[in-house]
């Protein structure tokens, strides 16, 4: 399910750089799946595989390209209503993200920001990087509760935004290159940064739903059991990679560890810690994720 292109090796013990993530999610937050695509039919296929009542929010960020045009937000919403088992509306009418609803950003507007109440700020835009902007806004609003999905499209629109979602602890998923090939958005995403899921369209929606159902907002503080599990994971990564994460606060290790745990299907951090202890490859993959972004918090 996950895309792991290579396992890095390391002989250095230099302290790693950790990605900056939120330690807790905003009160009452729920997972939101942001979908970028430049093809209406692909969006229809993806959303036809969704299901109601799973408490996920959905954000559609269309990607126009020089060789293709997209319908208006109203027409796109109408097309999705015909196939999706969820209510669909435009961002102008919705105003904010809510669970169990698909919100469509107009192709001629850019999602500039999402505030703590998940209200949307849109501005007119003729720039081609609207998917990047929308993904970044979601990443900074929700952190580990954000899920980014890149589907069919040309060029690189969305690749940088997807990397930002992952850097801040969220999930990055792309449609299989076998369905679209080189020079497409999925290809750009895979060459920009690591991604977590690479699957054909028919399977992608199912795996995104499964991951989203398992997500829950972080507690205000970690339990003693969670702290102990994170310490085990840190020691295991150090043992396999020789990089020491013990100098960092456990809250800073949690997003990457939780994402890997959920992707692999482990029921608890303890179970995942045992897996990292036994599997050197997993330790290197987690090390890579922990190093994915700039600076973070040391123990005080």
Functional labels for PLM-detected ranges:
Residues 300:
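Hydrophobic (often cysteine-bearing) scaffold residues that line and stabilize catalytic clefts
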Residues 2-297:
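Conserved acid/base catalytic micro-environments in cytosolic active-site loops
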């Amino acid at each position: 399910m996950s895309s792991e292109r290579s396992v890095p090796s390391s002989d250095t013990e230099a302290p790693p750089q950790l990605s900056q993530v939120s330690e807790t999610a905003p009160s009452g937050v729920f997972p939101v799946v942001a979908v970028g695509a430049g093809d209406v039919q692909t969006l229809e296929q993806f959303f036809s595989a969704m299901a109601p009542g799973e408490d996920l929010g959905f954000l559609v960020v269309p990607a126009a390209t020089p060789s293709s045009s997209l319908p208006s937000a109203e027409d796109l919403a109408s097309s999705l209503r015909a196939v999706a088992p969820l209510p669909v509306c435009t961002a102008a009418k919705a105003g904010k993200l809510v669970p169990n609803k698909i919100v469509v950003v107009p192709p001629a507007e850019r999602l500039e920001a999402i505030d703590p109440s998940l209200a949307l700020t849109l501005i007119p835009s003729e720039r081609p990087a609207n998917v990047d902007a929308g993904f970044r806004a979601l990443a900074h609003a929700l952190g580990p509760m954000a899920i980014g999905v890149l589907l069919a499209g040309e060029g690189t629109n969305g690749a940088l935004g997807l990397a930002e979602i992952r850097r801040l602890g969220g999930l990055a998923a792309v449609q299989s290159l076998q369905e679209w090939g080189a020079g497409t958005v999925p290809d750009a995403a895979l060459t920009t940064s690591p991604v977590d899921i690479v699957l054909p369209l028919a399977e992608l929606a199912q795996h995104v739903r499964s991951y989203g159902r398992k997500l829950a907002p972080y507690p205000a503080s970690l339990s003693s059991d969670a702290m102990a599990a994170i310490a085990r994971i840190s020691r295991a990564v150090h043992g396999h990679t020789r990089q020491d994460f013990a100098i960092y606060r456990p809250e800073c290790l949690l997003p990457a560890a939780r994402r890997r745990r959920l992707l692999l299907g482990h029921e608890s951090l303890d179970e995942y810690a045992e897996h990292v202890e036994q599997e050197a490859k997993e330790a290197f993959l987690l090390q890579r994720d922990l190093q994915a972004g700039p600076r973070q918090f040391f123990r005080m």
